[in-house]
Each structure stands twice: as C-alpha cells, then as structure tokens.
C-alpha cells in the first residue's frame, strides 16, 4: 500500500520517499548497525521505485505527470544521503544523482500547454515549489552549483504576490480554489510559507514583507 509504482493511491509512498532519507540523515548516529541496514535498504527501495516511475513515463520527454514531478528530488536526496553506504552500491547512487541533476538542470520546471504557464497552477504551487528545495540546497551547499539561479525560481515570488496573499482573488490557470489557514486542506497544501527561500533570495520588497508576515502552519 506504500508503493510508488502500483495503481492505487501513492500519497503514503510519496511521503515516505520524501521524509525517510532526511530523517535518517538526522538520526543515523543514534542507530544500531542493524537499524542502519534496515533504514538504508528501505531508502534504496523507495529510490528505486522513484527511478522506475520516471523511467516508465520517460519523464524527460513526458514531464506532465504531477506526482512524478516530485520524485526526482527524493531520488537525489537518497543518492546524497546514502553516499558511503556499505549496503547500496556507489554506481547506483551515482545513477540516481545523475538522473536527478539531468532533470533539474534540463527540462524542469516544465510548463503547461493550453494554460500557457507553469503546469501545476496556483493552488499546487505552494507545495510543488517546495518538494525539491532540500535537494537543491544540498547540491548548492556541497558543490556551489545553484539550481535556483534559473529565471523561474528568481521570479516565482512575484507570481505568488497575485494570489498567495490574504484577500487576493486572482486564481490563474482555472484552479478556482485557494486554501486559507482556517481550511482543513491547509496542512497538506500550504505546509510551508510559499514565499520562503524565493522571496528571501530574489523577491521584491513586497514579497519579502509577506514572507515575514505569512502565518505559520499549525
């Protein structure tokens, strides 16, 4: 039921693939050898499912699948965090890392067709511009290469100003729904301040102000 590659709902698997490598990195020093083995083989299993899903879709040629758009970062996180593992082959880690970097250095972010803009639209953008940030920032920290220097990332906080501010009514791309802090959907889709990182680095003064004032999720 937690698989990323079977026809049933993949949300649990996506969350596991995202969180397990990062949590493991934080607690590894507290684990026994057996626990390290189990954790690393579980992370490997999820990263292999990420890779299989991308390969089956031929993602670089067909990047429109929303959920698949999350997993290159999770695969990249696994590659970085498992570096030096005694249980996962280095050539496998290098393959995952190269695929993630090819996607984020090549076709990403992908754009929609008839909507004429970013494929995920306004509602999903509050979360879908966050999934890859841990991987981007790790690459930047360890290599100095800034994936965030692309124009999309430099300007996305200006896009948020049109709808991700209290009282704004502009819902582009036909989404028609916005999530406020009182909404039950808030924890899932607005789990993080959408201005964070983007406004801090690239935003105009108004975006930086809203980054500071945006209500924190409960």
Stretches found by the model and what they are:
Residues 1-164:
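Aromatic-lined, polymer-binding surfaces characteristic
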Residues 82, 124-218:
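Carbohydrate-active enzyme catalytic cores, enriched for enzymes
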């Amino acid at each position: 039921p937690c698989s990323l590659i079977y026809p049933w709902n993949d949300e649990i698997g996506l969350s596991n693939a995202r969180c397990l490598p990062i949590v493991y990195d934080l607690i590894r020093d507290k684990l026994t050898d057996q626990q390290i083995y189990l954790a690393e083989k579980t992370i490997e299993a999820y990263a292999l499912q990420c890779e299989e899903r991308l390969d089956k879709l031929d993602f670089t040629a067909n990047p429109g699948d929303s959920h698949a758009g999350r997993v290159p970062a999770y695969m990249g996180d696994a590659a970085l965090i498992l570096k030096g593992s005694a249980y996962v082959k280095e050539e496998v880690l290098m393959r995952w890392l190269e695929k993630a970097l090819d996607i984020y250095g090549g076709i990403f972010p992908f754009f929609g067709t008839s909507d004429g803009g970013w494929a995920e639209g306004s509602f999903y953008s509050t979360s879908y511009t966050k999934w890859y940030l841990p991987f981007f920032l790790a690459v930047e920290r360890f290599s100095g290469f800034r994936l965030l220097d692309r124009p999309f990332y430099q300007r996305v906080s200006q896009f948020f100003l049109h709808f991700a501010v209290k009282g704004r009514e502009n819902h582009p791309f036909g989404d028609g729904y916005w999530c406020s802090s009182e909404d039950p959907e808030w924890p899932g889709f607005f789990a993080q301040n959408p201005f964070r990182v983007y406004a801090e680095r690239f935003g105009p003064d108004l975006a930086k102000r809203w980054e500071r004032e945006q209500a924190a999720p409960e």
